[in-house]
Amino acid sequence: AAVVMSGELADCFSTKSEGVAWITRTVREVFPEALFYGTDGRFHDSPVPALAAANWLASAAFLHERDPEGLLVDMGSTTTDIIPLASLSSLYGLTDLTRLQKGYLVYTGLLRTTIPAIVRSVSLGGLPTPVSAEQFSISADAHLVLGHIGEEDYSCDTPDRKGRDRTSCLRRLARVVCADLDEIGTGGALQVAQAFWDAQREVIHDAVARAMDESGASRIYTAGTGSMLLSSALGGTDLSVELGP
């Protein structure tokens, strides 16, 4: 088995090295011959620092063979990876910290991002309205009520441990502005959702534009759980359609 990992940063581990060692040991208990792909572009049979968060590089190395001048935008539940394939050789060895610093790791995703992580104020009835810095609602709520995902795609826990239906999502979105549906109605909650998506799309678009300008990439490919949404927003090729989920 060939393995990549991204769970070493979980707060149940004191350090990344501890997480890498635990994941490596646990996987090899089930698959004794497993090899682990690292950010150095090599396979390893023991825990080394390069194994931390190497999942993005495996996708990039695969796609680079198809189009070395492309840009891969991979949106997951929590983050969005922006990978300039033309610069692949310079990407080896990057950690999540350095990718954040370079703009290649954008910490916003299709499902788990809290609303105030992206948007600070929304317009309600034409009035600028600051949002509360609470975990009342997440990106999955916004994308569901906007029709970007269905209930079956809402695969993470809800902030209030309640339903994933449209009404439950609207209720959570209303709380973002310290209100409820009785106070701002469905229309107000939808304005919160739209403001979030507008801001999220802009953050990703700006990072993509910067990476394309720096790398000279000429084509965009999208992947991950948010691939269809991003291919429409960015005008890229949806790999989830072309290659399958």
Where are these regions (language model features)?
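Active-site activation/catalytic loop segments of kinase-like enzymes and analogous catalytic loops
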Residues: 75
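Short, histidine-centered active-site or binding-site loop motifs used for metal coordination
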Residues: 5-9
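Helical "lid/coupling" subdomains associated with nucleotide-phosphate turnover
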Residues: 10-19, 26-38, 47-72, 81-245
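Conserved Rossmann-like nucleotide-cofactor binding loop
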Residues: 78
